[in-house]
Design a protein with these regions (language model features):
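Intrinsic low-complexity/disordered segments
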Residues: 1-2, 209
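Membrane-proximal basic amphipathic "stem/tether" segments
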Residues: 2-79
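Generic alpha-helical secondary structure signal
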Residues: 10, 68, 83-90, 96, ...
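S-adenosylmethionine/decaboxylated-SAM
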Residues: 11, 113-118, 124-282
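Residues that form generic nucleotide/phosphate-binding pockets
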Residues: 15, 73-77, 88-91, 101, ...
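Short amphipathic alpha-helical segments, especially helix-boundary/capping motifs
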Residues: 45-48, 60-64, 100-105, 113, ...
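Class I SAM-dependent transferase core
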Residues: 80-120, 132
């Protein structure tokens, strides 16, 4: 909610000059302004409690305006034309096979009562476009959870492979059940290692795209970047799914003199305020 219009400010100034009653009226006015916002957030939270099954890693769509902002962010990040970026965004959104797989696999999973079946990709649309444009040979994601992001990234890699630019997704997660959404044909280009990211990152070869989405503690996040740093290719991208709450990627970008960009999510019809995409490029 923005600033009060000039007429409202004028009325407030007149009211506040009234002896005794003026400050009380202005305080009530301010409380009403805040309550309008709080009431809307409370309504969204109630609808989520009623309709959603999720307890963490919330999924949602972006607002139409925020989706356009994501497209603008991707133009800046990739150097691609806006028309190409928008085409790639629609490519993922219109992927009927992926949509059906996520829906049916979620309904059939042991976590069906803790997950919303209908896929909502939000910022992961950006991940997809980055893979389609930059065509990395090795994508590494620390932190897989059920594997929605893994499926999105694998879908991009499958298309790249069909176009003559093969690549592979490697997920790392300490939970042995992580990645249960991955199945054929996505497993043709994707696999998951179960273990501690800090123990496994040092064993990898050349990384073209690193995504931090594991333990969201800034020092753990920075440790992952430090371990991956000597293994990054000259053109590697490094993305943080926690940049809305941590400055670790920004500190890494400054230390390595890499370009840093950030996109902030605005979820549509959800009480959660959203995460974002923190991205560093050479």
């Amino acid at each position: 909610m923005g600033a009060q219009p000039a007429s409202g400010v004028s009325r407030a100034r007149r009211l506040v000059r009234l002896p005794w009653l003026g400050p009380v009226l202005v305080a009530g006015w301010r409380a009403r302004t805040a309550w309008r916002h709080v009431a809307h957030e409370a309504h969204l939270a109630w609808r989520w409690w009623r309709d959603s099954r999720e307890v963490t890693n919330f999924t949602y769509d972006l607002t139409p305006r925020n989706r356009e902002q994501l497209a603008a962010f991707l133009v800046q990040a990739t150097g691609a034309e806006l028309s190409r970026v928008e085409q790639l965004m629609r490519e993922l959104e219109d992927d009927a096979a992926l949509h059906a797989h996520v829906l049916h696999a979620t309904l059939a999973s042991p976590d069906a009562n803790l997950s919303d079946a209908s896929p909502r990709y939000a910022r992961r649309i950006g991940w997809y476009v980055l893979v389609r444009v930059f065509r990395p040979r090795l994508v590494v994601e620390t932190g897989v959870d059920k594997g929605l992001g893994a499926c999105v990234l694998a879908s991009a890699l499958l298309r790249n492979t069909a176009e003559g630019s093969p690549g592979h997704y490697l997920g790392i997660d300490i939970n042995p059940q992580a990645g249960w959404l991955l199945a054929e044909p996505w497993t043709r280009v994707a696999s998951v290692l179960h273990g501690d990211s800090l123990a496994l990152l040092g064993n990898l070869a050349c990384i073209d795209f690193l995504i931090h989405d594991s333990h969201h503690h800034p020092e753990h996040e920075m440790r992952e970047y430090e371990l991956a740093r000597p293994r990054l290719s000259d053109t590697a991208l490094v993305l943080s799914d926690n940049a809305h709450a941590s400055d670790a990627l920004w500190r890494f970008a400054k230390d390595t003199k890499r370009r840093y960009l950030y996109f902030a999510e605005q979820p549509r019809d959800h009480w959660y305020r959203g995460a974002g995409i923190g991205l560093t490029l050479p």
